[in-house]
Amino acid sequence: GDGLDVGTAVTGLVTAFQRTPEAMMAFTFTLFTAMRSLLQQAGLPVNSVLYIVGIQGFGKSQLAKRYCTLFDDSTRRLPANSFDAGSTFASIRDALAQQRDLVVLLDDLCHSSIASEEAKRRKLLSRVIRSATNITSFGKKSGNRNVEITCAAGLVVTAEMLPSAASELTRCVLLRLDHQLADFEPS
């Protein structure tokens, strides 16, 4: 048939993990997210965020896109469920509720020279982390009434900055890149 055979794919993945251990951590989070519903049914905690942080050009976005987002959105020509700092909280929240056992990516939260813009990004980050990690449901307006929805997806964030509040940071699995990843071009 067409495409890669399983042996070639597994060998390629193991080789990538040997070259780039960060890739193994990212892919492991993706597998954890894929089993989220099963783990939740078993009563195990499933609410966490993979938070990939590092300076510009180290390969954060490519790492997340290559090892965490397994599907593409052919209309947008981006990984499926991929959002950036300009996205609305409502759109990200809806994806977190609807994309069961899939990764939702909040990509490229970077510093801004405009203080109000950076404050807006930090507020978005805070709200998204809390929505992705609260076990309880969160509200959404539907017409004149509030509808309670719960997070069903895993959240991956790529950023140049850490969350502001310690309570947000403790909800994250932190993957700090302190060097440029091999075979990763800056995006």
Language model features by range: what are they?
Residues 94-99, 121-122, 146-151, 164-168:
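Conserved catalytic network of the ASCE P-loop NTPase/AAA+ motor domain
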Residues 102-129, 160-170:
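Conserved AAA+/SF3 P-loop NTPase catalytic/coupling segment centered on the Walker-B
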Residues 105-107, 131, 138, 149-160, ...:
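Structural recognition of the conserved hydrophobic beta-strand(s) that form the central parallel beta-sheet
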Residues 119-146:
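Conserved catalytic/switch belt of AAA+ P-loop NTPases
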